[in-house]
């Protein structure tokens, strides 16, 4: 490491004669300012979180929220006996969400905080599986009784993980034509005596659309009338469970539907809290089998716990309560409406360019997906994503799952902090890129693959000569 003779802020590593090792512990300590600057400088190469239109995660909170989180960063959420007020704030958040989602008895709601929706979904899935196992104790476990879970192919990857980790057969309804999520009738047809439940997604990560949860419940009601099969529903509301209650109040998707056994959401998405915090609630105590709740007494009191992990920070739970207290229903409604307005306005501008076809418009989740227009052959969505990244915008390009792997799209997530001004800048940058993209003879992704194949053929030829 070369050492600049100018010490101080211009060269905070003054006095070091060599760079510290990257893949083993250094032999000795260094000054805190030096360690800070080394890490700080490396992190400058990360993308700008505010310009990351791929993530659903909250990237902005008020300074007061950050201050509260800093005051609580040393508190372990599991130590409820040592930190009773933090535990009380968690309980209040559960009650508030139960009221928001129309639980039969919000004051006595059953639920907990988690590290995010992935853990929340795992817990909800475990409850579904255990309830099914208890109902089928006479024949499970056995070779003939393998539990299965019905869902759309568009589910978040956590559901695939759940099925793999806990040996549940995933039964997925594929996409078809312009239907990019679950079909209720098709889902009901996949159910049998081994179905532990069905999952409805309130806000698909692929395109931001709501799945028809009420129609799914109606299809399962009809199935029960015809066959006697009683299939509960879990609503994965990672994003939509904090959008629909404020912007789509007439949409029935929650505990108002008797078949809905549990709901989860991500506090760190449209719950407007920094990562990571999630929530999972059950409609009543009967929906969460008692044997899944563990009780420990070695932290100073008899503590019930239902989680995949043990220790986790309490700061995010405190921040969630702060947001609930700070905004209230009207505040959340205003924030989410602003995000939806940005999404619908930006999608309309992109659709008007003529080079793209909108799949969704951001009028459910403030999220929309679009692809290239049918007559566009010079570039594809991967070219667009790459060029936008050169301007700092992080926009994901990806293909849809079965049976629409032929469809490649771009997705834009509009969230709190992505303002009208930023949306204008994004639209201007996209418009500015189009002339150059239109001038291409082929999508560069195709050219890249052609070049790769040519290089491989050349390598094989050289190898043969040797």
Describe each region flagged by the PLM.
Residues 1-108, 392-393, 430:
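N-terminal entrance/gating region of PLP-dependent enzymes' catalytic architecture
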Residues 90, 94-97, 120-129, 159, ...:
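Buried hydrophobic packing segments
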Residues 381-389, 426-431:
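Short amphipathic alpha-helices in soluble, non-transmembrane regions
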Residues 199, 366-378, 392-427:
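Conserved PLP-binding active-site segment of the aspartate aminotransferase-like
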Residues 223, 404-466:
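PLP-dependent enzyme catalytic core of the Aspartate aminotransferase-like
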Residues 106-108, 144, 360-367, 405-407:
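Short Gly/Ser/Thr- and Asp/Glu-enriched loop/turn motifs at secondary-structure junctions
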Residues 246-249, 253-366, 371-375, 455-458, ...:
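Active-site C-terminal subdomain of aminotransferase-like
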Residues 7, 115-294:
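Conserved PLP-enzyme active-site core in the AAT-like
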């Amino acid at each position: 490491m070369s050492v600049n003779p100018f010490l101080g802020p211009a060269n905070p590593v003054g006095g070091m004669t060599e760079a510290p090792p990257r893949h083993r512990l250094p032999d000795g300590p260094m000054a805190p300012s030096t360690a800070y600057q080394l890490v700080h400088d490396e992190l400058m190469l990360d993308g700008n979180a505010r310009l990351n239109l791929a993530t659903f995660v909250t990237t902005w909170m008020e300074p007061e929220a950050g201050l509260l989180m800093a005051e609580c960063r040393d508190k372990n959420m599991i130590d409820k006996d040592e930190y009773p007020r933090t535990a009380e704030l968690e309980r209040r958040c559960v009650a508030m969400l139960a009221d928001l989602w129309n639980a039969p008895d919000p004051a006595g709601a059953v639920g907990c905080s988690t590290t995010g929706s992935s853990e929340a979904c795992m817990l909800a899935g475990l409850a579904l599986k255990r309830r099914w196992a208890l109902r089928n104790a006479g024949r499970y476990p056995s070779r003939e009784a393998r539990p299965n879970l019905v869902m759309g192919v568009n589910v978040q990857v956590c559901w695939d993980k759940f099925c793999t980790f806990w040996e549940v057969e995933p039964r997925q309804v594929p996409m078809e034509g312009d239907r990019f999520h679950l079909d209720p009738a098709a889902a009901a047809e996949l159910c049998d005596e081994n179905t532990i439940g069905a999952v409805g997604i309130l806000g698909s990560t692929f395109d931001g659309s709501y799945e028809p949860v009420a129609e799914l419940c109606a299809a399962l009601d009809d199935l029960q009338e015809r066959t006697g099969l009683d299939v509960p529903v879990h609503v994965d509301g990672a994003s939509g469970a904090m959008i629909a209650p404020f912007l789509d109040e007439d949409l029935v998707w929650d505990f108002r539907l008797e078949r809905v056994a549990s709901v989860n959401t991500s506090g760190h998405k449209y719950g407007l809290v920094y990562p990571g915090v999630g929530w999972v609630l059950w409609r009543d105590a009967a929906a969460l089998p008692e044997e899944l709740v563990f009780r420990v007494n070695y932290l100073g009191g008899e503590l019930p716990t239902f989680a995949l992990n043990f220790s986790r920070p309490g700061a995010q739970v405190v921040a969630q309560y702060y947001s609930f207290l700070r905004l209230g229903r009207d505040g959340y409604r205003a924030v989410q409406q602003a995000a939806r307005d940005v999404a619908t306005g930006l999608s309309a501008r992109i659709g008007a360019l003529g080079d793209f076809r909108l799949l969704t418009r951001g009028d459910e989740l403030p999220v929309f997906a679009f692809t290239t227009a049918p007559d566009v052959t010079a570039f594809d969505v991967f070219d667009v994503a790459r060029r936008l990244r050169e301007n700092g915008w992080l926009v994901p390009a990806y293909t849809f799952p079965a049976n629409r792997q032929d469809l490649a799209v771009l997705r834009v997530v509009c969230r709190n902090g992505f303002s009208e001004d930023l949306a204008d800048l994004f639209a201007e940058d996209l418009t500015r890129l189009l002339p150059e993209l239109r001038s291409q003879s082929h999508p560069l992704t195709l050219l890249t693959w052609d070049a790769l194949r040519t290089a491989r053929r050349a390598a094989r030829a050289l190898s043969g000569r040797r």
